[in-house]
């Protein structure tokens, strides 16, 4: 076990919506442990200023069948129920017939080196508890929604730039969360970096409250949707024969981001991370990156063939990084 000054910080996610896909399977690890793994896609629909948005929230799922004491893991049993009994839109076809679900989990880090040697990093949702709910439950729990409640340390606050390189009025928050249970091991990866957009209507209040190095709790929407195409997004009329209206290619902009919708004032009176803890957190993060890079093996360059050897997907290596969301004490 490693000696540490770090303390775990709040990291919870609540996703409420319709089950769109269930992609779970039973498997066995290299050392013979039975498990269940895969993902569940939850459709979260909302209206923002009259604009309909449909978010596909992919929730990662993993559990070994047995705990260390030899008893069956309750999470495994729950995920089996999801796999065998939950009705998804993909299965039943009719959205209204698919199950409503409340997923509770956490935000984690998905990080790997791609085939061309580029390091790629993003946040994803890791599911823990799945519960089928009713329409009334959705209303009581203020859904549909996909919201992360994260306590984090601010690493930078910068202007968001538009397509012409000018400030858009939004801010980009970069920070990190610390997520672990029990004691840290030497090979632990407890640091969860995150990047989030602060919309223009909150940007001034946020920047007036926070400085680099501050610790606070942030409520963030998890967004993954396609923007509706405007007239400017439609390409020139296609050439062809007969009636060609509606055959134009339409460009769509896909939005995949965390969006800060509120937060507390910066922590004080010992609740905040101090300089020593921040320095240690950076060391843990450095070790995680070194481990990732040392484990990278360049793959052979694939051909342009659509089949055979050229069709192999990227070999990736992932780094993995709970209670109800508490939004009652948000200050902006």
What are these regions (language model features)?
Residues 1-9, 26-30, 132-332:
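Acidic, gly/ser/pro-rich intrinsically disordered tails
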Residues 99-148:
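Extracellular-facing segments of soluble proteins and assemblies that are Gly/Ser/Thr-biased and enriched
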Residues 10-12, 33-39, 54, 98-100, ...:
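A general secondary-structure signal for short beta-strands and their flanking turns/coil
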Residues 2-4, 27-30, 87-96, 110-119:
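Catalytic micro-motifs at enzyme active sites that drive phosphoryl/nucleotidyl and oxygen chemistry
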Residues 12-21, 96-109, 152-154, 211-226:
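OB-fold and OB-like beta-barrel modules that bind single-stranded nucleic acids
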Residues 31-81, 129, 159-198:
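OB-fold (S1/OB) nucleic-acid-binding surfaces
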Residues 69-103, 199-219:
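Short nucleic-acid-contacting surface segments enriched for D/E, G, S/T with interspersed K/R
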Residues 1-28, 32, 36-38, 62-67:
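Hydrophobic, proline/glycine-rich low-complexity stretches
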């Amino acid at each position: 076990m490693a000696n540490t000054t770090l303390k775990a910080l709040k990291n919870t996610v609540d996703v409420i919506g319709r089950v769109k896909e269930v992609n779970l399977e039973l498997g066995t690890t290299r050392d013979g442990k039975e498990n269940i793994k895969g993902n569940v896609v939850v459709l979260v629909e909302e209206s923002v200023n009259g604009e309909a948005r449909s978010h596909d929230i992919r929730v990662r799922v993993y559990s070994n069948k047995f705990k260390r004491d030899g008893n069956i893991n309750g999470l495994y049993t729950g995920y089996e129920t999801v796999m065998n009994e939950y009705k998804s839109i993909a299965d039943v076809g009719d959205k209204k017939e698919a199950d409503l679900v409340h997923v509770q989990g956490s935000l984690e880090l998905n990080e790997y080196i791609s085939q061309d040697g580029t390091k790629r990093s993003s946040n994803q949702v890791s599911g823990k508890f799945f519960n089928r709910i009713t329409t009334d439950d959705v209303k009581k729990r203020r859904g549909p929604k996909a919201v992360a409640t994260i306590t984090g340390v601010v690493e930078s606050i910068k202007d968001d730039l538009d397509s012409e390189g000018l400030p858009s009025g939004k801010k980009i928050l970069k920070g990190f969360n610390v997520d672990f249970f029990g004691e840290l091991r030497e090979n632990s990866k407890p640091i969860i970096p995150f990047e989030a957009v602060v919309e223009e209507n909150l940007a001034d209040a946020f920047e007036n409250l926070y400085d680099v190095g501050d610790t606070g709790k942030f409520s963030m929407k998890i967004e993954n949707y396609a923007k509706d195409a405007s007239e400017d997004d439609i390409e020139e009329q296609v050439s062809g024969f007969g009636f060609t209206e509606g055959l134009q290619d339409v460009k769509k902009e896909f939005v995949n981001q965390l969006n800060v919708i509120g937060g507390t004032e910066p922590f004080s009176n010992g609740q905040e991370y101090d300089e020593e803890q921040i320095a240690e957190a950076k060391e843990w993060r450095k070790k995680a990156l070194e481990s990732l890079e040392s484990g990278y093996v360049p793959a052979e360059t694939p051909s342009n063939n659509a089949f055979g050897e050229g069709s192999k997907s990227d070999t990736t290596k992932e780094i993995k990084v709970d209670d109800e969301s508490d939004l009652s004490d948000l200050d902006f």
